[in-house]
């Protein structure tokens, strides 16, 4: 295996048994690819912006004299980059400009001749851009647009499962769902009549729709029924016999042919009878007249002479009707073939209740339902009906819908029209009738072939189209105006509706969410989330159990483990690792092709639609080196069921054992040994882990850690191979290898690191270089670690030495006992950054002012402020300290003559203003790490603002000049290299800068003249580019900020708060084993082992059996072995063992896994690399145990033996307080523990006198409102049960909502009296008022 520079520093030993078939795909591709498709203009490619424009344009005026045509669109240059957008609180976007043509036609001519064409680029608003990490920056905050899993357009056949009607009769229905347009439902009622509903309105007989489609009753019967043909001969009635139609009937007559009786009267016809009749080739049989009564005529019968209708089609035959047929010499007549078994007379019965008889009455009936109360006219009714399903502007099935529609009706072609046609509606009704007749099955609505994923690009496109439709209406009206000749396209188009539609979507849509940025895993999971909620999706209240449940088609597409607990369970899911969406938006997952029992390397992605037809083997099925199955019968999945199949019949095989789970679940080692409920909690809690100051990789991982850390975008990845030229805490410079540099490309890459910036969840984002000067790196190497990453691997927590044992009740109910050593070593110390804003407004009474001159505040309180009244960076502050001094004008009060006099003498003006400074909130203390000041254009900048601007300018110029210098040096080196290759002598050139270099007139040989000329041009271009950059940067820094109306200045203060672990903080492992820290114990009191090494964390052993998450125990054992190997390496390094011995031991360790493909060969490593590897392994050997393919018991024991521990994984411990040995051996090992973002500091809260609710006069609730604890109904019962009457009275009156009582109480306490006078609780008054609102008067009698 080839390892990157960073990987070589610390190799994770992989114990997976399965070979790696497919690399883990880029984990953010679902977001990034979707937006790319939306934004990139491609002709003839109907998707994205292009498709939206094509669907709306050209827009014609009502009178047809003018039209506006779309030509193309371009995206402009972004005003601010990502970092600037975040700091300034603006949206990271680009201007969208569209080239339009206004074509004006001549009015007079009959032919439409073009009078003139005007072309112009029109500004269509700002389009938010996606960052390289798959997020959007909207108003300065990072947001994620979550993909939606919604019901695919198409046709669905379903039933009510017998729940609608009291009889329990199953009523079948079909629903045609377009991508946009009206829904059409076809349904049976309990009487077996067929009805339709348009847009879920009142139902009408289905034949009304057929009449509206211009089908006559006769035609309808011909389409939906087969006919029995009868004829009259010699006054006898004969029937053309089709034997299979008689099956199951009880015949009321004998069947006799040539005097031979085949079937007796009253006999039920069976398959045997049918075979007999077929064999004898009986074509006609004589029947009695009564057999015809009750049957339905299928054609109109006319009078031979007058041609008037004698008998209408769909008439039930009676004796009178039959006599008419006889009398008018109709030899042949046609009757509908129906029966009660598999040919119901549903359409015929529906026609009988249908009052409409022709197209016009049917159209008017539909019009009345869609537009109740409006008088119908023929034109209006026709227009409405055509617009419902047959107009491309109003109705679109979309390619997906058409594909699903055709597939459902078993048609061959996948493509077709986006609107419905007559055949579509008839085929849907036919299929529904077949299902009712028992000749088909209903669809499974939760099958993933019926649900598709709508990603960002598609949602933004829909929103954009909505905006364009609003614009279209306005444009149509403007085009009908008379003064078109003077107008240009930009005068006609108003882009407001488009930008407001897009703003609304990104700002307030249910699927555009504030990014979860606790740690890199939280980010990735949020971007890979798939929600069934949102516009056009489900609602929490209406979603039943079936929708939320795990479905067999989720396999490899949607994770069965990771979903939130609570009301959203099962509605919000996570994409599986290898899953992707296909062109139609259906989820697909990869499989290996199997041919004749041999597994090939060919990989095919299958969607849920295709997967049902194949037999698919498990990923862990044993195969030999030639790809043949070991066993004759293999466990496989087929059509959602498990079973044993012959190996020759297998079509595909899973790609990997972790194929079924999501990224979050795949990070849980030994997931296969955990109960699913706990695994769900484990996957969810990893997302809540707070990045610690010192990140530490897990000793026991799953091998997914590197992919997550790199794809999340928090680390810095090398774009090109090269050598580290310069490195410090905030910048890395890489010099590119000459052969990798293309012409006109700079030979240097500069990476600026993010330092101590605030995340959405107030955690700290900080990048730290993990390379050294002069290191050689390759493209894709990790250059710097971000939050929660360690050498390019995800590191959410810390490896802790844990023991499972009770300790004095301190680990009762999942509590966690922690050693003081953990706190002292800052293992779980985290940094939280708070942003506090001070806004300076222009009020009605005057302008607020930021100043250090604040009334009634002592010098000491202002000691940390500068002259402008803003705190210094680096100041340590605690709650109540002034951060920004601000004064607000007071309302003018009426002064007494004496005050006026005093004011005239002493010029006292300070009382006109009140102190409204920004202070540190309660319970917070920290260090000021940054100050940002935003000033409105035209407002005079204060001294501090100018200082900050100068500092930013200096930094920007320094950055750019240094960059230019590095590029210069680089070009000089390249020139020198070129000169050195020459054999001829050239005088040595000494020059301080390239300008001097190029000024010297040197005659170069022809060979290299061109190369040097190219470098010269490149340098000139670079200089130009840098001058432009400096100009732009200066302009951006100096220009005023766009602030909301009425705001003059905003000062943002960033406070860094360091939080150590403390009792009350929530901690968890990766297996759903969560608990609260109960005590931080002195290290000398903790249990210790034979070597005197104390335990870090003591956990409760009772937390394991009932929860069934044994993964934590196996992790503990494996962690112990990994640490043991680290100890051996550490001893070897300490005793200065020879490098070859270290190499030999490391090779032995890395050869432990079973998989030959994952064996690591250390022969290619240099001695320095081996030494570095050993130093990084002294803390412990990192092990990967992939999900469902992990380390087994035998291997754990082997590792424990190798690291000189008992194979039981238990050791003898001694009590730290008494020094006595514990009675039994204790399970001790290393577990990866996380500190979750549920910190006691954020939750701890106490209320003194605070705010009250306006109506009930009771204290508010919650920390944010400075509220109290609710004393509820059950708590009142408790006091009643104890008979604590005084306490109860106090609780219900003075401590709650007795307004007069509480003021008296306050007075009494002040004056030293300790008695209370309870009055009337306010809530009683509220009750009285509410009863009065019902018209009942209540008055209290004072007697």
Swiss-Prot record:
Family annotation (PROSITE patterns): RNA_POL_BETA
GO BP term (any one): DNA-templated transcription
Keyword Manganese in record: no
Protein name, UniProt field: DNA-directed RNA polymerase subunit beta
Subunit structure: The RNAP catalytic core consists of 2 alpha, 1 beta, 1 beta' and 1 omega subunit. When a sigma factor is associated with the core the holoenzyme is formed, which can initiate transcription.
Record NCBIfam families: PRK00405.1, rpoB
Matches recorded under InterPro entries: DNA-dir_RNA_pol_bsu_ext_1_sf, DNA-dir_RNA_pol_bsu_external_1, DNA-dir_RNA_pol_su2, DNA-dir_RNAP_su2_dom, DNA-dir_RNAP_su2_hyb_sf, RNA_pol_bsu_bac, RNA_pol_bsu_CS, RNA_pol_bsu_protrusion
EC number(s) recorded for this UniProt protein: 2.7.7.6
Protein task: DNA-dependent RNA polymerase catalyzes the transcription of DNA into RNA using the four ribonucleoside triphosphates as substrates.
Reaction(s) catalysed (UniProt annotation): RNA(n) + a ribonucleoside 5'-triphosphate = RNA(n+1) + diphosphate
Organism of derivation: Buchnera aphidicola subsp. Cinara cedri (strain Cc)
């Amino acid at each position: 295996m080839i390892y990157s520079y960073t990987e070589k520093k610390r190799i994770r030993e992989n114990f997976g048994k399965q070979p790696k078939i497919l690399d883990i795909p880029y984990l953010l591709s679902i977001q990034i690819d979707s937006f790319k498709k939306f934004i990139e203009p491609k002709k003839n490619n109907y998707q994205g912006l292009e498709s939206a424009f094509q669907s709306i344009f050209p827009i014609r005026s009502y009178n047809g004299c003018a039209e506006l045509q779309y030509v193309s669109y371009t995206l402009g240059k972004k005003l601010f980059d990502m970092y600037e957008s975040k700091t300034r609180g603006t949206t990271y976007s680009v201007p969208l400009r569209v080239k339009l043509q206004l074509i004006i036609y001549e009015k007079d001519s009959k032919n439409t001749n073009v009078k003139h064409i005007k072309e112009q680029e029109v500004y269509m608003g700002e389009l938010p851009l996606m960052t390289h990490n798959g997020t959007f920056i909207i108003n300065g905050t990072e947001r994620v647009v979550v993909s939606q899993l919604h019901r695919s357009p198409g046709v669905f056949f379903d039933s009510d499962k017998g729940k609608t009607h009291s009889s329990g009769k199953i009523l079948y229905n079909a629903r045609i769902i377009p991508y946009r347009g009206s829904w059409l439902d076809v349904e049976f009622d309990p009487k077996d009549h067929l009805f339709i509903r348009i847009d879920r309105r009142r139902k009408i007989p289905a034949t009304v729709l057929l009449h509206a489609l211009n089908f006559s009753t006769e035609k309808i019967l011909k389409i939906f029924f087969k006919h029995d043909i009868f004829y009259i001969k010699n006054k006898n009635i004969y029937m053309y016999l089709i034997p299979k139609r008689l099956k199951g009937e009880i015949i009321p007559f004998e069947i006799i042919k040539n005097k031979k009786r085949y079937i007796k009267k009253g006999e039920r016809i069976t398959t045997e009878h049918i075979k007999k009749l077929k064999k004898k080739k009986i074509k006609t049989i004589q029947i009695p007249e009564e057999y015809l009564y009750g049957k339905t005529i299928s054609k109109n019968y006319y009078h031979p002479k007058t041609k008037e209708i004698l008998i209408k089609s769909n008439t039930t035959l009676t004796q009178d009707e039959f006599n008419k047929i006889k009398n008018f010499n109709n030899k042949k007549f046609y009757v509908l073939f129906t029966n009660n078994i598999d040919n119901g007379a549903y359409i015929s019965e529906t026609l009988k209740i249908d009052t409409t008889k022709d197209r016009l009455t049917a159209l008017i009936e539909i019009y009345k339902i869609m537009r109740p109360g409006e008088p119908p006219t023929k034109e209006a009714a026709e227009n409405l009906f055509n617009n419902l399903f047959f107009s491309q502007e109003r109705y679109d099935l979309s390619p997906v819908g058409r594909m699903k529609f055709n597939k459902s009706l078993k048609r061959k072609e996948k493509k077709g029209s986006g609107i419905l046609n007559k055949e579509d509606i008839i085929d849907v009704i036919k299929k529904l009738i077949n299902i009712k007749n028992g000749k088909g099955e209903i669809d499974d609505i939760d099958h993933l072939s019926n649900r598709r994923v709508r990603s960002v690009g598609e949602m933004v496109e829909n929103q954009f189209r909505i905006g364009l439709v609003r614009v279209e209406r306005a444009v149509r009206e403007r085009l009908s105006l008379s003064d078109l000749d003077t107008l240009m396209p930009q005068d006609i188009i108003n882009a407001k509706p488009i930008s407001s539609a897009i703003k609304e979507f990104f700002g307030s849509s249910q699927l555009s969410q504030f990014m979860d940025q606790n740690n890199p895993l939280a980010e990735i999971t949020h971007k890979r989330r798939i929600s069934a909620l949102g516009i056009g999706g489900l609602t929490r209240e209406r979603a039943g159990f079936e929708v939320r449940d795990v479905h067999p088609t989720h396999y490899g597409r949607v994770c069965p483990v990771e979903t939130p607990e609570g009301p959203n369970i099962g509605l919000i899911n996570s994409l599986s690792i290898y899953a992707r969406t296909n062109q139609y938006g259906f989820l697909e997952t990869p499989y290996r092709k199997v041919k004749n029992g041999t597994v090939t390397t060919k990989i095919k992605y299958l969607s849920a639609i295709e997967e049902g037809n194949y037999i698919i083997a498990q990923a862990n099925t044993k195969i030999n080196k030639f790809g043949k199955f070991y066993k004759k019968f293999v466990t496989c999945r087929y059509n959602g069921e498990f079973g044993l199949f012959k190996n020759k019949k297998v079509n595909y095989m899973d790609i990997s054992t972790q194929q079924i789970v999501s990224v979050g679940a795949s990070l849980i080692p030994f997931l296969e040994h955990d109960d699913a409920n706990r695994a769900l909690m484990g996957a969810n809690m990893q997302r809540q882990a707070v990045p610690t100051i010192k990140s530490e990789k897990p000793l026991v991982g799953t091998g997914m850690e590197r992919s997550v850390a790199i794809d999340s975008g928090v680390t810095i990845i090398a774009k090109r191979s090269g050598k580290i030229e310069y490195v410090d805490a905030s910048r890395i410079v890489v010099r590119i290898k000459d052969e990798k540099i293309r012409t006109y490309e700079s030979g240097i890459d500069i990476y600026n690191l993010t330092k101590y910036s605030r995340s959405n969840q107030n955690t700290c984002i900080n990048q730290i270089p993990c390379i050294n000067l002069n290191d050689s790196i390759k493209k894709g190497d990790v250059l710097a670690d971000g939050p929660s990453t360690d050498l390019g691997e995800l590191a959410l927590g810390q490896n802790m030495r844990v023991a499972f044992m009770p300790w004095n009740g301190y680990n009762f109910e999942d509590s966690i006992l922690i050693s003081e050593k953990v706190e002292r070593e800052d293992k779980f110390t985290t940094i939280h950054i708070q942003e506090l804003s001070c806004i300076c407004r222009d009020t009605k009474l005057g302008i607020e002012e930021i100043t250090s001159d604040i009334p009634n505040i002592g010098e000491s309180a202002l000691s940390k402020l500068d002259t402008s009244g803003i705190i210094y960076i680096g100041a340590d502050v605690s709650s109540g300290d002034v951060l920004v001094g601000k004064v607000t004008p007071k309302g003018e009060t009426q002064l007494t003559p004496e005050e006026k006099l005093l004011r005239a003498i002493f010029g006292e003006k300070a009382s006109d203003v009140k102190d409204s400074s920004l202070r540190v909130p309660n319970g917070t203390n920290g260090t000021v790490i940054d100050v940002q000041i935003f000033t409105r254009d035209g407002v005079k900048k204060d001294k501090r603002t100018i200082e900050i601007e100068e500092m930013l300018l200096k930094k920007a110029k320094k950055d750019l000049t240094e960059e230019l210098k590095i590029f210069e040096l680089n070009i000089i080196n390249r020139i020198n290299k070129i000169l050195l290759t020459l054999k001829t002598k050239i005088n040595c050139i000494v020059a301080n800068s390239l300008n001097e270099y190029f000024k010297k007139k040197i005659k170069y040989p022809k060979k290299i003249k061109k190369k040097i000329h190219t470098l010269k041009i490149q340098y000139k271009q670079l200089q130009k580019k840098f001058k432009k950059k400096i100009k732009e940067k200066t302009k951006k820094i100096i220009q005023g900020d766009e602030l909301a109306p009425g705001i003059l200045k905003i000062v943002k203060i960033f406070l860094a708060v360091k939080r150590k672990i403390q009792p009350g903080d929530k901690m968890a492992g990766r297996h759903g084993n969560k608990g609260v820290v109960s005590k931080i114990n002195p290290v000398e009191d903790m249990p210790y082992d034979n070597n005197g090494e104390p335990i870090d964390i003591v956990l409760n052993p009772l937390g394991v059996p009932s929860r069934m998450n044994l993964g934590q125990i196996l992790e503990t054992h494996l962690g112990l072995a990994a640490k043991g190997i680290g100890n051996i390496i550490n001893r070897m390094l300490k005793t200065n063992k020879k490098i070859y011995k270290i190499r030999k031991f490391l090779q032995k360790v890395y050869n432990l896994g079973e998989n030959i493909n994952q064996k690591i060969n250390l022969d290619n490593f240099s001695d320095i690399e081996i030494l570095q590897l050993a130093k990084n392994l002294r803390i412990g050997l990192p092990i990967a145990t992939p999900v469902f393919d992990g380390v087994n018991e035998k291997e754990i024991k082997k590792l424990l033996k190798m690291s000189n521990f008992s194979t039981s994984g238990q050791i003898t411990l001694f009590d730290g307080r008494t020094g006595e040995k514990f009675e039994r051996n204790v399970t001790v090992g290393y577990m990866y523990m996380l500190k979750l973002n549920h910190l006691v500091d954020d939750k701890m809260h106490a209320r003194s006198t605070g705010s009250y609710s306006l109506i009930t006069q009771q204290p508010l609730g919650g920390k944010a409102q400075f509220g109290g604890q609710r004393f509820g109904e059950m708590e009142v019962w408790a006091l009643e049960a104890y008979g604590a009457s005084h306490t109860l009275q106090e609780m219900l009156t003075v401590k709650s909502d007795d307004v007069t009582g509480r003021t008296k109480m306050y007075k009494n306490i002040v004056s030293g009296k300790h008695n209370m006078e309870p009055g009337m609780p306010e809530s009683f008054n509220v009750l009285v008022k509410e009863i009065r609102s019902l018209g009942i008067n209540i008055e209290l009698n004072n007697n």
